[in-house]
């Protein structure tokens, strides 16, 4: 009986019962009248008369007029003061319900370990992401982004090699950079170890060289020396300090991406909780 906890459901149930009772009463009254009453009244002059059945010159029933006027008043209240044009919306109600559910969800699963987070992320990925990225997250032979590299140094190297677009930054599209694999790896190591909040790299010996290349190849022109991508307090380019973090992943899930391969739609309507985003990130970083 959980549906009775919603006042709209209760109102609808009461209204349905009232309508049912009135329908039964009115139907029984009409049936009785049809059985016992006799036709009487003055026929309309020049009115319809077919097989002896004519049209009486009776006034419109008061009850019908009252019902009609009440319907007009109710419709005016409903549209302008009650729901649609005032405050209520189905999308808003849905978002509130999802928000409440997410709070219960996070409270229930807030103490998950690493393995459980990966398992949760795997379930979310298979339902929402695998159709394009494949069940192995490798991108279905190039038809979508390879997420096995995402959030890691390999992902940065891939961006350096192919460029990036579709995030609608003021800087515009990032062009591909003509660097060999060793130099790209050095920049990726520097970004992961010094700029990103991840603060670790598989190639610490390349950090210094990566910093030199980051500055000399013009990366600071868009991303800034600190990698935050801000110019005059405006978001000019991608924030590299968030790369490989929950904020970076949520930004893509929220806005989608029109990349070199195809168009990833926004998943904002899914209202993923912070825990679900964390689970997806743990799956990606495993």
Swiss-Prot record:
It is a multi-pass membrane protein. The chain crosses the membrane at residues 11-31, 62-82. One of its GO terms (molecular function) is heme binding. Binds 2 heme C groups per subunit. Pathway: Energy metabolism; oxidative phosphorylation. Heme c 2 binds at residues 174, 219, 222-223. Component of the cbb3-type cytochrome c oxidase at least composed of CcoN, CcoO, CcoQ and CcoP. This is Cbb3-type cytochrome c oxidase subunit CcoP. It comes from Helicobacter pylori (strain ATCC 700392 / 26695).
């Amino acid at each position: 009986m959980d549906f009775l906890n919603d006042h709209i459901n209760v109102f609808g149930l009461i209204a349905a019962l009232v309508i049912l009772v009135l329908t039964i009463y009115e139907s029984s009254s009409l049936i009785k009248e049809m059985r016992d009453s006799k036709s009487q009244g003055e026929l309309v002059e020049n009115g319809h008369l077919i097989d002896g059945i004519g049209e009486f010159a009776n006034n419109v029933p008061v009850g019908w007029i009252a019902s009609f006027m009440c319907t007009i008043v109710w419709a005016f209240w409903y549209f302008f003061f009650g729901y649609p044009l005032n405050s209520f919306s189905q999308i808003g109600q849905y978002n509130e319900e999802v928000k409440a559910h997410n709070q219960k969800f996070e409270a229930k699963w807030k103490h998950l370990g690493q393995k459980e987070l990966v398992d949760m992320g795997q379930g979310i990925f298979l339902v929402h992401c695998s159709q394009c990225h494949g069940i192995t997250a490798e991108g279905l032979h190039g038809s979508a982004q390879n997420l096995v590299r995402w959030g890691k140094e390999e992902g940065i190297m891939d961006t350096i090699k192919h460029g990036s677009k579709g995030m609608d930054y003021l800087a515009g599209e990032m062009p591909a950079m003509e660097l060999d694999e060793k130099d790209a790896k050095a920049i990726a190591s520097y970004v992961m170890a010094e700029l990103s909040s991840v603060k670790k790299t598989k190639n610490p010996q390349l950090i210094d060289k990566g910093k030199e290349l980051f500055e000399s190849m013009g990366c600071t022109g868009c991303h800034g020396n600190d990698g935050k991508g801000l110019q005059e307090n405006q978001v000019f380019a991608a924030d590299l300090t968030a790369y490989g973090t929950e904020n970076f992943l949520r930004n893509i899930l929220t806005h989608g991406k029109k990349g070199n391969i195809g168009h990833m739609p926004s998943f904002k309507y899914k209202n993923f909780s912070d825990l679900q985003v964390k689970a997806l990130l743990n799956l990606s970083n495993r």
